[in-house]
Amino acid sequence: MKLTCVLIIAVLFLTASQLITADYSRDKQEYGAERLRDAMGKFKGSRSCGHSGAGCYTRPCCPGLHCSGGHAGGLCV
């Protein structure tokens, strides 16, 4: 009986803390889409030019590098 009461109180406490936290953070992400877009720009796959050793089939090599092996499967060197 005591264990059941302790479990019920623990569940009520955790539920209340989740509801309080959810209500507090509701308006905190006003510019979430902008932050996501800025973070996506930092990924390796979204760079505008191919760095040394990168493939040059889908994007051009960065300045100072050239495509070795042709555009059908070459690498930026």
Curated annotation (Swiss-Prot):
Instruction: Give tissue specificity per the record.
Output: Expressed by the venom duct.
Which residues form the propeptide in this entry?
A: 23-47
Signal peptide coordinates: 1-22
Please name one Pfam family that this protein belongs to. Conotoxin
What are the disulphide bonds in this sequence?
49-62, 56-67, 61-76
> In terms of domain of life, where is this protein from?
Eukaryota
Q: Name one GO molecular function term.
A: ion channel inhibitor activity
Give the UniProt keywords, A-Z.
Answer: Disulfide bond, Knottin, Neurotoxin, Secreted, Signal, Toxin
Location in or out of the cell: Secreted
Annotated Gene Ontology cellular components are: extracellular region
Reproduce the free-text note on domains from the UniProt record: The presence of a 'disulfide through disulfide knot' structurally defines this protein as a knottin.
Protein family (similarity comment): Belongs to the conotoxin O1 superfamily.
Q: What is this protein called?
A: Conotoxin LiC42
Organism, by scientific name, is: Conus lividus (Livid cone)
